[in-house]
From Swiss-Prot:
Keywords: Antibiotic resistance, Antiport, Cell inner membrane, Cell membrane, Hydrogen ion transport, Ion transport, Membrane, Plasmid, Transmembrane, Transmembrane helix, Transport. GO terms for biological process: proton transmembrane transport; response to antibiotic. PROSITE patterns: MFS (PS50850), SUGAR_TRANSPORT_1 (PS00216). It is a multi-pass membrane protein. The chain crosses the membrane at residues 6-26, 44-64, 79-99, 102-122, 135-155, 159-179, 213-233, 244-264, 277-297, 298-318, 341-361, 363-383. GO terms for molecular function: antiporter activity. NCBIfam families: tet_MFS_A_B_C_D, tet_MFS_G. GO terms for cellular component: plasma membrane. It is found in: Cell inner membrane. The lineage of its organism: Bacteria, Pseudomonadati, Pseudomonadota, Gammaproteobacteria, Vibrionales. PANTHER family: MAJOR FACILITATOR SUPERFAMILY (MFS) PROFILE DOMAIN-CONTAINING PROTEIN, MAJOR FACILITATOR SUPERFAMILY DOMAIN-CONTAINING PROTEIN 10. This is Tetracycline resistance protein, class G. Belongs to the major facilitator superfamily. TCR/Tet family. Resistance to tetracycline by an active tetracycline efflux. This is an energy-dependent process that decreases the accumulation of the antibiotic in whole cells. This protein functions as a metal-tetracycline/H(+) antiporter.
Length: 393
């Protein structure tokens, strides 16, 4: 069973690399299809369309994986991604580009189903470690992808999309050959599958008791959108960073997060337990946010990165807490819901935090980091509630 978890990790890394490959050149491709003044608007719309489709469809695909198994849904997701990138690589007109993003968003359950596969394949005591590995693989893919995409973009704006399609095709073959089904209690009932759309508005009965932890998950994902949306702008405004320094800081940010998630999450959760590991991560990240708000020199950011990376151990611990409180036949629904919440935060976070930054930067541009730290404090009363460590529903 652990072999399936390892294959799932490889697929997550390849999928993330495919996503990262296209980011540096998507604006360039858009310039071939629309006037220059419309590029930014369409770029944002394409990113939002993917995230919105994930909000709606990721929980549904997770439910399908509970009913029909992880393997067929994961294969469909990888095939959908390969088709999406192929369409985008050869898009002759703008609407075809939108169709490609729509297809990818609808079928893009790779992360959710991979997480369900890992939950199926690992015991409760080791899930935080494996979810940490998954976060590290995703981070490594998102570091390597943009770097490779930038190089391929020098050849052609279409080349990174072709490479992303090939990567997902390779992941598809990898899953076909090596991935074994890990959810063996599915199917065989003869009953029609009841798929619940808009699951965030109507949680499954088995997940409803975890509403408070879902709220914590969403808040933490929302906080993560502060650096995602404002790292470059803040570095340029506060420290007058140039492009090279911005790139170096982003590479260091991603690398330290991947290292901590891969090598610190497991030992720390084994020693402290998932709840205390989560609290440790929140404290480290919140402290890093406050220090960033008051940093006056660019070099100060780099030691602060260690605190932010330590904060990254909290999310795998929280994901393990949630997974340990759900039975095996609801892991897909759970992971799909978490993917939906993640994408919802990626829509709301940049809009809210960039608006806050614009409104407060004239007086002091550190407020957005203070607000992020305050949001962590909101989670503390919720986490004081007792939650079961293993609840089979």
């Amino acid at each position: 069973m652990r072999s399936s978890a390892i294959i799932a990790l490889l697929i997550v890394g390849l999928d993330a690399m495919g996503l990262g490959l296209i980011m540096p050149v998507l604006p360039t491709l858009l310039r071939e299809l629309v006037p220059a003044e419309q590029v930014a608007g369409h770029y944002g719309a394409l990113l939002s369309l993917y995230a919105l489709m994930q909000v709606v469809f990721a929980p549904m695909l997770g439910q399908l994986s509970d009913s029909y198994g992880r393997r067929p849904v994961l294969l469909a997701s990888l095939a959908g991604a390969a088709v999406d990138y192929t369409i985008m690589a050869s898009a002759p007109v703008l609407w075809v580009l939108y169709i490609g993003r729509l297809v990818s968003g609808v079928t893009g359950a790779t992360g959710a189903v991979a997480a369900s596969t890992i939950a199926d394949s690992t015991g409760e005591g080791s899930r935080a470690r494996w979810f940490g590995y998954m976060g590290a693989c995703y981070g490594a893919g998102m570091i390597a992808g943009p770097a490779l995409g930038g190089m391929l973009g020098g050849i052609s704006a279409h080349a990174p999309f072709i490479a992303a399609a090939l990567l997902n095709g390779f992941a598809f073959l990898l899953a076909c050959i090596f991935l074994k089904e890990t959810h063996h209690s599915h199917g065989g009932t003869g009953k029609p599958v009841r798929i619940k759309p808009f699951v965030l508005l109507r949680l499954d009965d088995a997940l409803r008791g975890l509403g408070a932890l879902f709220a914590v998950f969403f808040i933490i994902q929302l906080i993560g959108q502060v650096p995602a949306a404002l790292w470059v702008i803040y570095g340029e405004d506060r420290f007058q960073w140039n492009t090279a320094t911005v790139g170096l800081s982003l590479a260091a940010f991603g690398a330290t997060h991947a290292i901590f998630q891969a090598f610190v999450t497991g030992p720390l959760s084994s020693r402290l337990g998932e709840r205390r590991t989560l609290l440790f991560g929140m404290a480290a990240d919140g402290t890093g946010f406050v220090l960033l708000a008051f940093a006056t020199q660019g070099w100060m950011v780099f030691p602060i990165l260690l605190l932010l990376a330590a904060g990254g151990v909290g999310m795998p611990a929280l994901q393990a807490m949630l997974s340990n409180n759900v039975s095996s036949n609801k892991q897909g629904a759970l992971q799909g819901t978490l993917t939906s919440l993640t994408n919802l935060s990626s829509i709301a976070g940049p809009l809210g935090f960039t608006a806050l930054y614009s409104a407060t930067a004239g007086a002091w541009n550190g407020w957005v980091w203070i607000v992020g730290a305050i949001l962590y404090l909101i989670c503390l009363p919720i986490l004081r509630r007792p939650f079961a460590t293993s609840l089979v529903i």
